Amino acid sequence: MKELRLQASAERLEDVQEFVRGKLEAAGGSLKVMSQVEIAVEEIYVNIVHYAYPSGDGEAAIRCETDREVPKITIQFLDAGTPFDPLAKEDADISLSAEERSIGGLGILMVKKLMDEVTYCYEEGKNILTIVKYL
């Protein structure tokens, strides 16, 4: 699995997007799949930037792998920030109006809808969120 390590900062979002885009292009991902993956990658990475390290700077790692036998891309997001399982929270109720709905949860709901698989684990002091999209 190829890995990109970087300071978790908003300024590095484009580096993350380019890293994943390169893998998708090499694997022959369609424009639709590329757009869906880019949205999910942005949402997850921005959440790491904003919430993983409340006391300051921290590092993030993005691992990316494509599989030609079963055409898919697997992307892992790792950080050593505050332990947080975004999948443990109940999905946002999108049938409610914006005023009635509690704040938060729409981004991870969007990721779950766009990706084919989304899993989370906390191992060796790291949050590991894995997304899979079939090509």
Positions of PLM-derived features:
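A conserved short beta-strand within the histidine kinase catalytic ATPase domain
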Residues: 58-66
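Glycine-rich phosphate-binding loop
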Residues: 100-115
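Flexible, glycine-/charge-rich segments associated with ATP-binding catalytic modules
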Residues: 1-4, 8, 112-135
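Conserved short strand/loop->alpha-helix "switch" segment adjacent to the catalytic nucleotide/phosphoryl-transfer site
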Residues: 20-42, 100-102
